């Protein structure tokens, strides 16, 4: 399980050129465009009779995805992405575990 704080002091390579506070959030994939060429080509191919025209991928190998963090500088608002290792569970800004604390 990975717990990441909501703010982090790290280097800003834009105008700041120094370590500043960054707002941390998890990267999410955007909405797919219906007008992109590949999508239009696929939709045209799927039209009419003949069923599924391209193979549907079934040999999934990975059980987890790599976590991608979006870091935004609080001073200049520059955004950058940082990849982390693979993990099953991911938390943002949860309370830190204390040594010798009660386990429920």
Curated annotation (Swiss-Prot):
Keywords: Cytoplasm, Ribonucleoprotein, Ribosomal protein
Location(s), subcellular: Cytoplasm
Gene field: RPL44
Pfam families per the UniProt record, alphabetical: Ribosomal_L44 (PF00935)
Self-association and partners: Component of the large ribosomal subunit. Mature ribosomes consist of a small (40S) and a large (60S) subunit. The 40S subunit contains about 32 different proteins and 1 molecule of RNA (18S). The 60S subunit contains about 42 different proteins and 3 molecules of RNA (28S, 5.8S and 5S).
Gene3D superfamilies: 3.10.450.80
InterPro entries hit by this protein: Ribosomal_eL44, Ribosomal_LSU_eL42, Ribosomal_zn-bd
Organismal lineage: Eukaryota, Sar, Alveolata, Apicomplexa, Aconoidasida
GO biological process, one term: translation
Superkingdom to which the source organism belongs: Eukaryota
Name the UniProt record assigns to this protein: Large ribosomal subunit protein eL42
Function: Component of the ribosome, a large ribonucleoprotein complex responsible for the synthesis of proteins in the cell. The small ribosomal subunit (SSU) binds messenger RNAs (mRNAs) and translates the encoded message by selecting cognate aminoacyl-transfer RNA (tRNA) molecules. The large subunit (LSU) contains the ribosomal catalytic site termed the peptidyl transferase center (PTC), which catalyzes the formation of peptide bonds, thereby polymerizing the amino acids delivered by tRNAs into a polypeptide chain.
CC terms in the record's Gene Ontology section: cytosolic large ribosomal subunit
Family label: Belongs to the eukaryotic ribosomal protein eL42 family.
PROSITE patterns listed in its UniProt record: RIBOSOMAL_L44E (PS01172)
GO molecular function: structural constituent of ribosome
